[in-house]
Curated annotation (Swiss-Prot):
InterPro entries registered for this protein in UniProt: Flagellar_assembly_factor_FliW (IPR003775), Flagellar_assmbl_FliW_dom_sf (IPR024046)
NCBIfam families in the cross-refs: PRK13285.1-1
SUBUNIT field: Interacts with translational regulator CsrA and flagellin(s).
GO BP annotations, alphabetical order: bacterial-type flagellum assembly; regulation of translation
Key words of the record: Bacterial flagellum biogenesis, Chaperone, Cytoplasm, Translation regulation
Compartments where located: Cytoplasm
Descriptive protein name: Flagellar assembly factor FliW
Family indicated by similarity: Belongs to the FliW family.
Database matches in Pfam families: FliW (PF02623)
Length: 145
């Protein structure tokens, strides 16, 4: 099926749709998303809304940012996302890229997006740790691509 997004018109297969039952904080009214890869922005990917073409969030693999990144998914979240196989789980961190000032980009390592790729279910979880912040300057890290 074709969808209009901020990144242009894209073709999304049914198995590429990710449902966020409670939305994403700040976008609670939106439930259907997909992850889009653009060659020009790698390693940054895009979590695009399939319900509001103006919403697309830049995301990145947190282990590219911090190779020692640690995440513990609660039993409650495992149950909610119906995770049976941890190998089928994707984790992304949301980036904030200030308009006109990409050098000030921050990454949210405290509240990653967790997706059960097998079931197409996603959720932004908040890690129970003080180790990570909601706004880490991306420039503080050396990339581990």
């Amino acid at each position: 099926m074709k969808y209009n997004t901020r990144l242009g018109e894209i073709e999304i297969n049914e198995n590429e749709i990710i449902t966020f039952e409670k939305g994403i904080p700040g976008f609670e009214h939106l439930r259907k998303f997909s992850v889009i890869s653009l060659k020009d922005t790698l390693p940054i990917l895009w979590l695009v809304s399939l319900e509001d073409e103006n919403v697309s969030l830049p995301i990145i693999d947190p282990w590219i940012v911090d190779k020692n990144y640690e995440i513990e998914i609660s039993n409650e979240d495992i149950k909610e996302l119906e995770i049976e196989d941890k190998e089928k789980v994707a984790v992304w961190a949301i980036l904030t890229i200030p308009s006109g000032h990409p050098e000030e980009t921050t990454v949210n390592l405290r509240a990653p997006i967790v997706i059960n790729m097998e079931k197409g279910k996603g959720k932004q979880i908040i890690l129970d740790t003080e180790k990570y912040k909601i706004k880490h300057k991306l420039s503080e890290f050396s990339f581990q691509e």
